């Protein structure tokens, strides 16, 4: 019974959103009202549309209980407040994927769980960093500069990179901490590398924790106190070190922690 009620609610929400998006006028009216109550003149000035079109849209929103009218003013109903908030998040999500379209379209995103995608609006202030023909290492060098100056590090590491590990060890020597989530191949490479004994020593001091994911990794994620970065694999399985998403805002770092926690839940401690 609870499942049926939940399904019915989600279906009704879907129908409402689909109804709103079938018109340019309806979402515009709803989002205006999310800022403040408005009258017909307010709508006319902002939208530059004739009164007849605006009134038609308002009546449609009133009919499905998203807005209410009090004399000459219109305001959101309780249902309308919730719907407008969902609509704003949807538009923010679409904007994020639009401005970085090539990044998302050209790479595999199968390793990013739905929970993270539902909150992708948190990435709205991200910067796309990309190498070019004049500097093929531009993106990776930018990443190394960033991680070299950060404090505590939480990293999902799907590939073995010596340059990367050398900088991490320098940070550890400065007293920073590392949480590393990786796969079987990278962990095996770490164990046979010249860096492993140092990592073991730092682990004994409580500075390092290395965990192994129980499935293949197709994301390279770094989370620090003041930035996050995300790079992905091509759809053919090759890692792309030529570009990454960078975010230095609180919301972007929150999104990265959501993604990292999902992998943390499905990992086992190795060191």
Please report, for each region that a protein language model flagged, where it lies by residue.
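HKD (HxKxxxxD) catalytic microenvironment of the phospholipase D
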Residues: 209-251
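HKD-type phospholipase D/PLD-like phosphodiesterase module
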Residues: 185-220
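Amphipathic coiled-coil/heptad-repeat helices and related helical stalk/stem segments
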Residues: 13, 136-140, 161-165, 195, ...
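Signature of lipid phosphatidyltransferase scaffolds
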Residues: 105, 235-271
């Amino acid at each position: 019974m609870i499942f049926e009620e939940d399904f019915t609610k989600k279906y009704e929400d879907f129908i409402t959103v689909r109804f709103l998006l079938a018109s340019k006028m309806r979402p515009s009216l709803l989002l205006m009202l999310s800022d403040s109550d408005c009258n017909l003149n307010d709508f006319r000035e902002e939208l530059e549309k004739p009164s007849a079109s605006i009134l038609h849209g308002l009546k449609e929103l009133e009919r499905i209980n998203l807005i209410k009218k009090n004399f000459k003013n219109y305001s959101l109903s309780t249902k309308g407040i919730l719907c407008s908030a969902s609509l704003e998040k949807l538009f923010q999500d679409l904007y994020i994927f639009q401005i970085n379209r090539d990044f998302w379209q050209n790479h595999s995103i199968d390793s990013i769980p739905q929970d993270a995608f539902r909150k992708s609006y948190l990435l709205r202030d991200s910067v796309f960093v990309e190498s070019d023909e004049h500097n093929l290492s531009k993106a990776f060098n930018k990443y190394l500069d960033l991680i070299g100056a950060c404090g505590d590090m939480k990293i999902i590491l799907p590939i073995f990179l010596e340059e990367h590990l050398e900088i991490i060890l320098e940070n550890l020597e400065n007293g920073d901490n590392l949480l590393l989530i990786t796969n079987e191949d990278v962990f095996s490479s770490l164990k046979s590398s010249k860096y492993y004994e140092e990592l073991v020593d730092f682990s004994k001091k409580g500075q390092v924790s290395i965990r192994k994911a129980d499935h293949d990794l197709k994301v390279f994620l770094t989370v620090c106190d003041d930035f996050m970065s995300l790079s992905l694999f091509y759809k053919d399985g090759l890692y792309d070190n030529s570009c990454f998403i960078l975010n230095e805002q609180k919301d972007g770092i929150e999104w990265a922690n959501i993604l990292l926690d999902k992998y943390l839940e499905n990992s086992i401690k190795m060191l």
